[in-house]
Amino acid sequence: MTLLALGINHKTAPVSLRERVSFSPDKLDQALDSLLAQPMVQAGVVLSTCNRTELYLSVEERDDLQEALIRWLCDYHNLNEDDLRNSLYWHQDNDAVSHLMRVASGLDSLVLGEPQILGQVKKAFADSQKGHMKASELERMFQKSFSVAKRVRTETDIGASAVSVAFAACTLARQIFESLSTVTVLLVGAGETIELVARHLREHKVQKMIIANRTRERAQILADEVGAEVIALSDIDERLREADIIISSTASPLPIIGKGMVERALKSRRNQPMLLVDIAVPRDVEPEVGKLANAYLYSVDDLQSIISHNLAQRKAAAVEAETIVAQEASEFMAWLRAQSASETIRDYRSQAEQVRDELTAKALAALEQGGDAQTIMQDLAWKLTNRLIHAPTKSLQQAARDGDNERLNILRDSLGLE
């Protein structure tokens, strides 16, 4: 059994590739079923966010393992293997464990130390448990990563400063508009990122917020909290002209805001500028919108410079966090190896007990038939000794024939021979 982590993220692939490799929430079960149908995959978790798509797997070793998994990923998303191969990373065993711990702790995020990723990892794990999780090793790896992420946040200052994609989006808005108290903001979506954006905007006393979402009920809960108006996604075309700032983050597989829609809104606004911040993957706003005069479009990749400005105080904490992760990953792999040894020990003991029970039963039967006790006991001892040392003897003989002194020494040590 081997633990794997493979995927792409904001550091290895642009948004144009990440959106093609992402898994939509409504098709996640189908993707997991397809993944687990691969003969080498024992268990799997799919993590798909705006900044990364990753597969965490428990697999059986085989020579073409990497090629088979890349082929599955490309076939599933209808991608050319060459397009994906150069952006794909691949981690195995200790490196896979360390990678997941870093991801869950926010050490591999676009925003160093951001807490939202832990919730996303937990959700990915929970989704995988709906009939998909089969290997205790993978499950244990995730559970351990959750506790490591908590330890990192508790023992370091990695989360001391409030920087996130949501915070960066609001920072961008405040840089472009002198005061948010005079602007109207349209938020598209009502997920965790938009919730954070809405709370940031409320703190900066934005004049008006409108929330457009597929399901009104979820949006209404957020709207009640931040004092916003709720509209349907179908109303965006009509209401877009009111918005000075549009911040969008949905799980829609297709753009929600198109170039024509923005053109009409700008015309109604007499070309007053609009800021559009698209933090969704796949993108919610057609890229062509950025070519329009007075429409200022920023994608999640464009937020990098803003985010980088806020990272200085987290870098020292990240060094401490990396030390914790390295220690915890090493301890987890030691535990995993111990589990493997425990299984071998159980099998060996069970085998010895079967031999003991079999030969003891024969000896007792011979005694009941009136056989000589001393002869029967000597025969039992002789047969028991021969049966128990047979396999080690064969291994020692084979190692000697092969000239494998290292194996001979290991066997001598295992048998307690000086």
Swiss-Prot record:
Known catalytic reactions: (S)-4-amino-5-oxopentanoate + tRNA(Glu) + NADP(+) = L-glutamyl-tRNA(Glu) + NADPH + H(+)
One short Pfam name that applies is GlutR_N
Where is the site Important for activity? H99
Q: Which GO terms describe its molecular function?
A: glutamyl-tRNA reductase activity; NADP binding
Q: What class of enzyme is it?
A: oxidoreductase
Per the record, the domain of life is: Bacteria
Keyword list, A-Z: NADP, Oxidoreductase, Porphyrin biosynthesis
Annotated GO biological processes are: protoporphyrinogen IX biosynthetic process from glutamate
The EC number(s) attached to this protein equal 1.2.1.70
Catalytic center at which residues? C50
Q: Give the binding site residues for substrate.
A: T49, C50, N51, R52, S109, E114, P115, Q116, Q120
Name the SUPFAM superfamilies on file: Glutamyl tRNA-reductase catalytic, N-terminal domain, Glutamyl tRNA-reductase dimerization domain, NAD(P)-binding Rossmann-fold domains
Q: Does the keyword Oxidoreductase apply?
A: yes
Keyword NADP assigned to the entry: answer is yes
Residue positions annotated to bind NADP(+) are: G189, A190, G191, E192, T193, I194
Q: In which pathway does it act?
A: Porphyrin-containing compound metabolism; protoporphyrin-IX biosynthesis; 5-aminolevulinate from L-glutamyl-tRNA(Glu): step 1/2
Q: Which PANTHER family match?
A: GLUTAMYL-TRNA REDUCTASE
Subunit and partners: Homodimer.
HAMAP family, sorted:
Glu_tRNA_reductase
| Family recorded in the similarity comment | Belongs to the glutamyl-tRNA reductase family.
The free-text domain note is: Possesses an unusual extended V-shaped dimeric structure with each monomer consisting of three distinct domains arranged along a curved 'spinal' alpha-helix. The N-terminal catalytic domain specifically recognizes the glutamate moiety of the substrate. The second domain is the NADPH-binding domain, and the third C-terminal domain is responsible for dimerization.
Q: Which NCBIfam families match?
A: hemA (TIGR01035)
Additional comment: During catalysis, the active site Cys acts as a nucleophile attacking the alpha-carbonyl group of tRNA-bound glutamate with the formation of a thioester intermediate between enzyme and glutamate, and the concomitant release of tRNA(Glu). The thioester intermediate is finally reduced by direct hydride transfer from NADPH, to form the product GSA.
Entry protein name:
Glutamyl-tRNA reductase
Phylogenetic lineage: Bacteria, Pseudomonadati, Pseudomonadota, Gammaproteobacteria, Enterobacterales
